[in-house]
Amino acid sequence: MLIIFLFFYFCYGFNEPLNVVSHLNHDWFLFGDSRSDCNHINNLKIKNFDYLDIHPSLCNNGKISSSAGDSIFKSFHFTRFYNYTGEGDQIIFYEGVNFNPYHRFKCFPNGSNDVWLLNKVRFYRALYSNMAFFRYLTFVDIPYNVSLSKFNSCKSDILSLNNPIFINYSKEVYFTLLGCSLYLVPLCLFKSNFSQYYYNIDTGSVYGFSNVVYPDLDCIYISLKPGSYKVSTTAPFLSLPTKALCFDKSKQFVPVQVVDSRWNNERASDISLSVACQLPYCYFRNSSANYVGKYDINHGDSGFISILSGLLYNVSCISYYGVFLYDNFTSIWPYYSFGRCPTSSIIKHPICVYDFLPIILQGILLCLALLFVVFLLFLLYNDKSH
């Protein structure tokens, strides 16, 4: 019976992938919002940690940059700003919900929130893919050495755009990016028959964009190397970047991990993060159930608490299907894996069917287990005979 039990244990239930975000070692960092903002407790009527989706023991480890009511996308574009800053080899994102269809943002009354959700997808796709190659992330301002007569034609009752800004195009405008390895800047246009370009004066590279389709501010997000750039357009006004995401301290490729950031079903959410988070640069984790918090309906959900609980311990392997605690055997192939990963061959096939070396190792383990049981029975028999 013991042999049968061990056989099925090793073949069908050992070291299955876990639906959590975690890390291979202590060199990790999390970017989040109120669900991981430990300082937000000071602003709450009921001062407890039930609103968190992370374990409170993580609050003072210096590995979290989070702010209630904020998101990296919102801070990138609008006057509502939090300087997300952090460094780590393995990067986790759990934010984004604070800009979604529930806020219904658009530049004009006849504009389109759908355009902004498309902008959100493009932004996070660029953020995730870049962050797989860099350890450090922060915001930087883009200075201009000329006086700019700007106008703001994009704001709502809750948000006001300040990246990019718009100026009348009367002369050439330049900006310089120095100090970081890579920058993410917006290039945005309203619906028109015009185009705009960034020219790298040092290399001659040209980055251009035109928008003749979308009835709102349509943006692409361009990764620029350090250098001096000239802004040119065929339109009567320029859109100028004022803030950039700074990527620094390059590393070997490490996929980022993204946890879905959404409301309870009573509020409208979107799928921008899952669309933006694609292999091979990003692993996406989600709960199959509705978000139902215990502090309030949008804070403290047990499913997402379970996903974030993986931050409490190191794992051996991170993959598309989940994380693996051990590096020995598994019944699920660690697809697009990173770390010290278990051996297996065919997705969703039990290991005992095909992997020859693990079968030999399992046979040795089973024989040792059998000999141990026989030895215990022998000792028990001798003890009774005396």
Curated annotation (Swiss-Prot):
Signal peptide: 1-11
EC number: 3.1.1.53
Superkingdom in the source lineage: Viruses
Reaction catalysis annotation: N-acetyl-9-O-acetylneuraminate + H2O = N-acetylneuraminate + acetate + H(+); N-acetyl-4-O-acetylneuraminate + H2O = N-acetylneuraminate + acetate + H(+)
UniProt-annotated catalytic positions: 34 (nucleophile), 296 (charge relay system), 299 (charge relay system)
Disulphide-bridged cysteine pairs: 38-59, 107-154, 180-246, 188-219, 277-282, 317-341
Compartments, as annotated in UniProt: Virion membrane; Host cell membrane
Esterase domain 2: annotated span: 237-349
PTM statement from Swiss-Prot or TrEMBL: N-glycosylated in the host RER.
GO biological process, one term: fusion of virus membrane with host plasma membrane
Glycosylation sites (chain numbering): 83, 110, 145, 168, 286, 328
Keyword Disulfide bond attached: yes
Membrane-side (Intravirion) residue stretches: 381-386
Region (Esterase domain 1): 1-121
Role this protein plays: Structural protein that makes short spikes at the surface of the virus. Contains receptor binding and receptor-destroying activities. Mediates de-O-acetylation of N-acetyl-4-O-acetylneuraminic acid, which is probably the receptor determinant recognized by the virus on the surface of erythrocytes and susceptible cells. This receptor-destroying activity is important for virus release as it probably helps preventing self-aggregation and ensures the efficient spread of the progeny virus from cell to cell.
General remark: Isolate N1 belongs to genotype A.
Quaternary context: Homodimer; disulfide-linked. Forms a complex with the M protein in the pre-Golgi. Associates then with S-M complex to form a ternary complex S-M-HE.
Protein name from the UniProt record: Hemagglutinin-esterase
Provenance organism: Human coronavirus HKU1 (isolate N1)
Phylogenetic classification of the source organism: Viruses, Riboviria, Orthornavirae, Pisuviricota, Pisoniviricetes
